[in-house]
Swiss-Prot record:
Record-given protein name: Isocitrate dehydrogenase kinase/phosphatase
Active-site residues, as the UniProt record annotates them: 371
Coiled coil: none
Function field: Bifunctional enzyme which can phosphorylate or dephosphorylate isocitrate dehydrogenase (IDH) on a specific serine residue. This is a regulatory mechanism which enables bacteria to bypass the Krebs cycle via the glyoxylate shunt in response to the source of carbon. When bacteria are grown on glucose, IDH is fully active and unphosphorylated, but when grown on acetate or ethanol, the activity of IDH declines drastically concomitant with its phosphorylation.
Primary localization class, coarse: cytoplasm
Location of the protein in the cell: Cytoplasm
Source species: Salmonella dublin (strain CT_02021853)
Taxonomic lineage from the root: Bacteria, Pseudomonadati, Pseudomonadota, Gammaproteobacteria, Enterobacterales
């Protein structure tokens, strides 16, 4: 190879990342206009297109590098020099951490995910941890109640870049003050102040004002979801001030925020204080840097592995017919492999399953579908694998595994947040906890359906319970769009004997779903059946599902709230707008 080619390759990769992140910011910057114009379908399209940008630009760089090297092979020393040159470009680079992930992605694409070693990749960052640089402009602005909280909040809302009129700004300010007074106490409020992020966080049909509320007892989140009425007027829907509420808003089962972040590392550090339970990976995920979040997730896994002597075991719960799932007993994530062969009733291919997982990645997850990270050639030390799991891997997925002696390489897997399987949770709880779980399950089904997602297999085992008690769907092999399903009523029996027959007396075509049948497996437990009939009986009616389909086909996009309906100002203090009810 000619001298100096290593530097040219390093510069080409970094320039490719610059182009990718520039487009990322460009798509993100359109969020305000999409919100103001209520162009909700454009919101959904922008979300999908932004996700695809990263892989698209990796592909462009790979093609450039193949032209530069003229297809000639590169030896190990050459690759090390490329990484050394790239590392030297990063100390003064503002998005160094994601640039390292982009380098990794280009390398993996070029070399088909082989020879993934720390010498060739940025397995860990080359830069000091949480590197602080001089920030060209502050990320947030401070507001103090020198002239009272009403004046403070009026300044905050008036400073927003939104160009729509307010429905009733004074009313919203009264509601915010009422909430803060109830939460903090009237005496504490004058001693508090607020720091507000300069950029709004857009998602679905809301623009979120994200801030920090400094009190005598510490710092709390200060979150205001701003919505628009059908008439184009702004209103604040609620005020959230607990870390648990903020954690749900920034949760792993929600779509990524659109927030303009030219310095993502600085924004992540700023958010960390109000989201103490979130890992670095989760914070990057929340602001839409999902590929770097994957890097951080892998680093968190390696750090856990280095400090633990646990062995990988099969994950608790009913064994899946499509996926083999394993975990580390104390780790908060699970590893999912597509089996080589599925149970006979699962008439699908591995390619179909991967397409379903990609659909979830790109779709609005409405807080009810867990996000995943996809890995290839994932290496495990055999000494850390329980013998029972090793036997299961060899039995269920031998074609996905390469034996390297002391290690195995898993050709493809997903990593996903670990939850308590809902069927296990329901066995362990009684009373109000049981009622809450059934209410949450039904709400999850409704919200998925409203977002044009039909889970397919609605058994409790395919859902999990998060640490906040939310029910989240995580088994995607039968997922499809609501508009692809034919919801039917079961025809009346022709004769009494029909209902006793082993085969149905009516024809069933692919895509047919009979909601009346849900009752058989959802209400079999006598503790659960009455609760389900009380709260969610309409899920057993085909006309309920067909009505949702009609709304979807007419182009209606449902409102999605990251908090309970009872927390909305319209419920707590009075009517606000004519927008749809919270689900």
């Amino acid at each position: 190879m000619p001298r100096g080619l290593e530097l040219l390759i390093a510069q080409t990769i970094l320039q490719g990342f610059d182009a990718q992140y520039g487009r990322f910011l460009e798509v993100t910057s359109g969020a305000q206009q999409r919100f103001e114009q209520a162009d909700w379908h454009a919101v959904q399209q922008a979300m999908k297109s932004r996700i695809h940008l990263y892989d698209h630009h990796v592909g462009l760089v790979v093609e450039q590098l193949r032209c530069i090297t003229d297809g000639k092979s590169t030896d190990a020393d050459f690759l090390l020099r490329v990484k050394e040159h790239y590392t030297r470009l990063l100390p003064d680079y503002p998005r160094f951490e994601i640039a390292e992930s982009f380098f990794n992605s280009v390398y993996c694409r070029l070399f088909d995910h082989r020879s993934l070693t720390p010498e060739r990749l940025f397995i860990f960052s080359s830069q000091p941890e949480r590197r602080f640089r001089t920030i060209p402009r502050p990320l947030a602005k401070d507001f103090f109640p020198d002239h009272g909280w009403e004046t403070l909040l009026m300044r905050i809302l008036s400073d927003l870049p939104l160009r729509l009129p307010w429905q009733n700004k004074s009313r919203d300010i009264r509601y915010i003050i009422a909430h803060l007074t109830e939460t903090l106490g009237e005496d504490a409020l004058p001693c508090c102040h607020v720091q507000v992020a300069n950029e709004l966080f857009y998602r679905n049909k809301a623009a979120w004002l994200v801030g920090k509320l400094t009190t005598p007892d510490g710092t709390l989140p200060f979150l205001l979801p701003i919505h628009r009425t059908d008439e184009g007027e702004l209103f604040v829907d609620t005020c959230l001030t607990t870390t648990a509420e903020a954690s749900i808003v920034f949760g792993f089962a929600r779509s990524y925020f659109m927030v303009y972040a030219p310095l993502p590392a600085a924004l992540v550090e700023w958010l960390r204080e109000i989201l103490p339970g979130k890992t670095t990976a989760e914070l990057y995920m929340a602001i839409g840097c999902q590929k770097h979040a994957k890097t951080e997730s892998y680093r968190e896994y390696l750090c856990y592995l280095a400090e633990s002597d646990e062995k990988f075991i099969e994950a608790p719960g009913i064994r899946g017919m499509v996926m083999l799932v394993f975990t580390l007993p104390g780790f908060d994530r699970v590893f999912k492999i597509i089996k080589d062969k599925f149970a006979p009733q699962k008439e699908m291919s591995a390619a179909h399953v991967r397409a379903c997982y990609q659909l979830v990645k790109e779709h609005d997850r409405v807080g009810r579908m867990a996000d995943t990270q996809e890995f290839e050639n994932f290496v495990l030390d055999k000494r850390q694998i329980d013998p029972a799991l090793m036997a299961l891997l060899r039995q269920e997925a031998p074609e996905k595994i390469t034996d390297l002696g002391e290690h195995i390489v898993i050709r493809h897997l997903y990593i996903e947040r670990r939850m308590v399987p809902l069927n296990i949770w329901l066995e362990q709880v009684e009373g109000q906890q049981l009622r809450d779980a059934i209410e949450e399950y039904g709400n999850a089904i409704r919200q998925l359906a409203a977002a044009n997602i039909f889970p397919g297999d609605m058994l409790f085992k395919n859902f999990g319970v998060t640490r906040h008690g939310r029910v989240v769907f995580y088994d995607y092999d039968e997922i499809c769009y609501m508009t692809e399903v034919n919801f039917r009523d079961i025809p009346p029996a022709r004769y009494p004997e029909d209902e006793l027959a082993s085969e149905p007396w009516y024809s069933v075509s692919p895509g047919d779903v009979f909601p009346e049948e849900f009752r058989h497996w959802l209400c079999a437990d006598p503790r659960i059946g009455p609760l389900f009939e009380e709260m969610h009986a309409d899920l057993f009616r085909a006309d309920y599902w067909r009505a949702l389909q009609t709304r979807i086909k007419e182009g209606h996009v449902e409102d999605v709230y990251a908090y309970r309906r009872r927390q909305r100002f319209s419920v707590r203090y009075g009517a606000i707008s004519s927008t749809a009810n919270s689900s």
